[in-house]
Amino acid sequence: MASALEDPALQRHFKGHKDAVTYVDFSPDGKQLASSSADACVMIWNFKPQSRAYKYPGHKEAVTCVQFSPSGHLVASSSKDRTVRLWAPNIKGESSVLKAHTAVVRCVNFSSDGHTFITASDDKSIKAWNLHRQRFLYSLTEHTNWVRCARFSPDGRLIASCSDDKTVRIWDITNRLCINTFVDYKGHSNYVDFNPMGTCVASAGVDSTVKVWDIRTNKLLQHYQVHNAGVNSLSFHPSGNYLLTASNDGTVKILDLLEGRLIYTLHGHQGPVLSVAFSKSGDQFASGATDAQVLVWKTNFDKYNIKEIVKLQQKRTCPEAPPHLNDIYPKTPHLHTSSGHSIEINPMFELADTQTFDPPIIDVGANFPYCRQTKALHTLNKYERNDNVCNYPMPPLASSVEGQKEHPLVGVQGALPRSLSNTLEQIVDQLNVLTQTVSILEHRLTLTEDKLKECLENQQKIPAHASESD
């Protein structure tokens, strides 16, 4: 399979944090990227050329996680200051604060319908919250040590969590009970997530391993030993065929789950890589590290069928149709080591001037007075009530800061009506599909021509062999 792939390539290089980047997450439309940092700030990076990045101070200690809501109109962040903040990702940077736990909050994650989010904490608990009312719902408390990560399944019926008690647990949110426990006696996991079909979970271990478990059969399917240090984060490609991993060894690795092997090793960061994430379309992925940098990569591999596979996966997230997975092969547990050859990519040798990718940064905390919590709650609630609706308008953005030259801002709608804007976006998507279809046809035509050439060459050899035999 690797021979048909194209190598990933570094696209963007964002530098604005003053300390380690702890988490990265793409907006649902792929036009923005959120990052959290140990510098106690959240940043929103815009992919539109010559646009500004937004920097949101507000947390009192390191921010551990950040995530867009399914609609993309809210961003949630968790912090060592024991709080969770909900931000409107615009130039005003309004936020509401939830005093979520009695210890460090490690993770925050939205359900696919956008109605609920969960938090994981060093107080050994997982808590669920109603997003619209910003109220506590329930706790899951069977872990006996710090909870590092908690994630919803794609259909929202299950939660996967990992803890320093060396277990990965699967929870049924209807009954609020732990229905499955995977134990790893060699060390705890730093991160856990469901595959796009919701039938497997992958864990990133401090023992430098990556494990894929089948939650239907309660068996370990795949066990990868490809990193030289602890694994901090992982992300499934939307197709479910590839897994992205980040490690303290300073590398990002890409695993082919169908063939059960490592295919790419990416060198771009100067220090441990703490977070990785695929975009919702799968055509990009991002990484954040202790070097305070955010790198955005072009996927390139599996480019011919990304869109169709993603569409099929999205159709199978409906709770009325329980998923059936055949995308993890082989079905027997076995160890995968780094003994096989992977393609090493070091973009820093090819990208001499990475600073040109750094956008201007608006420090929201410096430019605008901090909004009182009551006002922020009122503003956010206006959007949270409609968080599952994708097309409501954002509030008007403030003008540029005094003394600075005015620049266009990403996310600001021009004079175009919403319906016309949506129509144009659909046309662009259709053109992209047509372009991709043409690429596929060209690829198939090339293969056909090669086969035909081979047949003609073999046909010419037949008379020669016949005369030799006579």
Curated annotation (Swiss-Prot):
Family, similarity comment: Belongs to the WD repeat POC1 family.
Self-association state and partner proteins as the record states: Interacts with pat.
Annotated PROSITE patterns: WD_REPEATS_1, WD_REPEATS_2, WD_REPEATS_REGION
Main location: cytoplasm
Domain of life: Eukaryota
Protein name stated in the entry: POC1 centriolar protein homolog B
UniProt keyword Repeat, yes or no: yes
Subcellular location: Cytoplasm, Cytoskeleton, Microtubule organizing center, Centrosome, Centriole
Function: Plays an important role in centriole assembly and/or stability and ciliogenesis. Involved in early steps of centriole duplication, as well as in the later steps of centriole length control.
Record-level GO cellular component terms: centriole; cytoplasm
Entries under InterPro entries matching the protein: G-protein_beta_WD-40_rep, WD40/YVTN_repeat-like_dom_sf, WD40_repeat_CS, WD40_repeat_dom_sf, WD40_rpt, WDR55_POC1
